[in-house]
Amino acid sequence: MARRPHNAPPQRDTGPRVNDKIRASEIRLIGADGENVGVVHPAKAMAMAEEAGLDLVEISPNATPPVCKIMDFGKYKYEQQKRESEARKKQKIIEVKEVKFRPNTDTHDYEVKMRNVYKFLENGDKVKVTLRFRGREMAHQNLGRELLERVAEDVKEMGKIENMPKMEGRQMIMMIGPLPQK
């Protein structure tokens, strides 16, 4: 075990209390096969757990009296980690994809870029539509705004506009989010 720096706070045990760590004066005991034994003294419950070759695990510490169960703690921890990893797998990470346009983007290029926007929205990702102005194009910001409004109109069946087009330096940016799944 690694040494702890002298100024670090003591490590807190985050898991459920097990065996002799249970400090209640009496507990509600659930047996190894799930039957309710009743309210007993922790020492008696510990003796029953040792006799069965298992651990006494505090399941709900906030109940009165606290509920404890006779079970294999290693197996319980393993099952809990498995459940947590399954929950993490099911979470969808929403990424922000970026599609860049120019004020003079031609029809075919526009269609190709829009196909990408549709694909990203179908996958449940957000899309950041960036319109970059170069040199004297800054004088024609209205063309850029019209292009982004056209993009917004084309994606309204698949996504919703989260941020309306706004200027950031030499770029006009708009965020599109996917519609919630029904």
UniProtKB/Swiss-Prot annotation:
Compartment(s): Cytoplasm
Organism name: Ruegeria pomeroyi (strain ATCC 700808 / DSM 15171 / DSS-3)
Pfam families in the record: IF3_C, IF3_N
Keyword Ligase: no
GO CC, one annotated term: cytosol
Family stated for the protein in its record: Belongs to the IF-3 family.
Quaternary structure annotation from Swiss-Prot or TrEMBL: Monomer.
Region span, Disordered: 1-20
A single GO molecular function term of this UniProt record: translation initiation factor activity
Protein name as catalogued: Translation initiation factor IF-3
InterPro entries, per the entry: T_IF-3_C_sf, T_IF-3_N_sf, Translation_initiation_fac3_CS, Translation_initiation_fac_3, Translation_initiation_fac_3_C, Translation_initiation_fac_3_N
